[in-house]
Regions:
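S-adenosyl-L-methionine-dependent methyltransferase catalytic core, i.e., the SAM/SAH-binding region
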Residues: 1-174
């Protein structure tokens, strides 16, 4: 069921627009590749600062719909106020589950995913993604999910940490 994914869905009417925290690189080129059509169904899998979402919405007609996913609660401040948009606070790995839920399973016309860590995450000392600031060693995209990086570093064995660095950090000499 959808409850097991710890998600929240809100429409734009329930959330106000806030200033963005990230400017997308190659914004127009990325959205051009989506070939926005009248009545289409689209997904922005990484809402973040909302830059791609706003550009997609600007190209859509009134019959189209856009679903925006983000597991980071900070992204909620960037949700555009538009009835053609539905925000889903969840990891995009559950895309197919949500599209089935909304009746759009197999009907998404284009998907955009701006993968990676945004400048917002590096600029927030509480997130623990940057060497520039003193702060907690958190490093989670979803602040409610799993253990922090500090908990992992302080509880896992040296062997297990070496495996993690090898598999996910591409440190072949770990």
């Amino acid at each position: 069921t959808l409850k097991e994914y710890n998600w929240q869905m809100k429409t734009c009417a329930q959330i106000t627009t806030a200033e963005t925290y990230h400017v997308p690189v190659m914004l127009h080129e990325a959205v051009d590749g989506m070939d926005i059509q009248p009545g289409g169904i689209y997904a922005d899998l990484t809402l973040g600062g909302g830059g791609h979402t706003r550009e997609i919405l600007s190209r859509m007609n009134q019959n189209a719909h856009l679903y925006g996913f983000d597991q980071d609660e900070d992204a909620e401040q960037n949700i555009p106020s538009d009835e053609r948009f539905t925000f889903v606070r969840s990891n995009f790995r559950y895309l197919s589950n949500f599209m089935r839920y909304y009746g759009a399973d197999g009907k998404v016309d284009a998907i955009l995913a701006d993968l990676g860590v945004s400048s917002h995450h590096f600029d927030d000392s509480e997130r623990g993604f940057s060497f520039r600031f003193d702060g907690k060693l958190d490093m989670r995209m979803n602040k409610r999910a799993g253990r922090t990086a500090a908990e992992l570093v302080n509880t896992l064995s040296e062997e297990k940490l070496a495996d993690i660095f090898y598999l996910y950090g591409e440190l072949k000499n770990s």
